[in-house]
């Protein structure tokens, strides 16, 4: 685990691809538990350590995750994410070039709890949630393309 930033209120860590942020049905150790153990050892805290999960990244995604070290900070950060005061930006390396160098993708997502997966559809289907993604091609090599994308929707 790599700590990128830490103060009295938050800790920001680099999540590697394949790690989970919160516990799920797989039983794999989540990053949140690894961070709790780190804080417990670093500050020699007896008993339970508070750590609030402010957002998640999917298992196959790597990137920075912000955890709240106090319940008060968790409330503040949750409000900032809820009101889009925090702007999430993603970089993706893909093998196929996008049709346009810049654009918007709209899909409808359905979560399958039994499979622990989500599925994307081009048209609205029962129990789906609309997801919007804005992307821009920012570079490429001979075999790969780098996209910068943002999402105004929480999905």
Annotate the PLM regions:
Residues 1-151:
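RNA pseudouridine synthases
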Residues 153-155:
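Positively charged, low-complexity/disordered segments
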């Amino acid at each position: 685990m790599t700590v990128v930033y830490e103060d009295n209120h938050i800790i920001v860590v680099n999540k590697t691809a394949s790690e989970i942020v919160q516990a799920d049905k797989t039983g794999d150790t989540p990053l949140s538990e690894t961070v709790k153990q780190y804080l417990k050892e670093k500050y020699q805290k007896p008993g339970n350590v508070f750590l609030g999960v402010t957002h998640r990244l999917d298992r196959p995604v790597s990137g920075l995750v912000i955890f709240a070290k106090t319940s008060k900070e968790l409330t503040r950060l949750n409000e900032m994410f809820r009101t889009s005061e925090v702007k999430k930006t993603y970089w993706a390396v893909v093998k196929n070039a996008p049709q346009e160098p810049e654009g918007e993708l709209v899909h409808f997502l359905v979560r399958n709890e039994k499979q622990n997966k989500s599925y994307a559809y081009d048209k609205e289907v029962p129990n789906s949630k609309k997801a919007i993604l804005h992307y821009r091609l920012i570079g490429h090599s001979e075999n790969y393309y780098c996209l910068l994308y943002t999402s105004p929707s929480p999905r």
